[in-house]
């Protein structure tokens, strides 16, 4: 047998990860019914008749709350592996994490002072 380095496994994994969704999407396109009637083009409202238009305006405050949520959600994603390996990383990694948290807190205070978190 051939000895594979880590790159061949990575290439195979990426190929498999690209191939499976492509096959699933092409299979669904081949197997789906092709009826494009007027009822099929209407929106589905949990079995109810649609009320109003589909294009409505949302308040910009929803966007601001979502943006702040995403920022702190990404912070959690970055800090979780750090917290798991904290005892192995040492003091320098602790200081770097504190700087990272401080930058995010400065951003939160800025958003708070600008009124991005106030619903008025």
UniProtKB/Swiss-Prot annotation:
The name this protein goes by in its record: NAD(P)H-quinone oxidoreductase subunit 3
GO molecular function term, any single one: quinone binding
InterPro entries the UniProt entry points to: NAD(P)H_OxRDtase_bac/plastid, NADH_UbQ/plastoQ_OxRdtase_su3, NDAH_ubi_oxred_su3_sf
Organism this protein belongs to: Acaryochloris marina (strain MBIC 11017)
Transmembrane regions listed in the UniProt entry: 10-32, 64-84, 89-109
Pfam families to which the protein is assigned, alphabetical: Oxidored_q4
Assembly information from the UniProt record: NDH-1 can be composed of about 15 different subunits; different subcomplexes with different compositions have been identified which probably have different functions.
GO cellular component terms, semicolon-separated: NADH dehydrogenase complex; plasma membrane-derived thylakoid membrane
């Amino acid at each position: 047998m051939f000895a594979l380095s880590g790159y061949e496994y990575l290439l195979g994994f990426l190929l498999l990860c690209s191939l499976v969704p492509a096959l699933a999407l092409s299979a669904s396109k081949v197997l789906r019914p092709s009826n494009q009637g007027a009822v099929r083009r209407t929106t589905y409202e949990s079995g109810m008749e649609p009320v109003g238009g589909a294009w409505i305006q949302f308040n910009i405050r929803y966007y601001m709350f979502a943006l702040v949520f995403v920022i702190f959600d990404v912070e959690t994603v970055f800090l979780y592996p750090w917290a798991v390996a904290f005892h192995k990383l040492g003091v320098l990694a602790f200081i770097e994490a504190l700087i990272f948290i401080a930058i995010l807190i400065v951003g939160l205070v800025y958003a708070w002072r600008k009124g991005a978190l106030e619903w008025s």
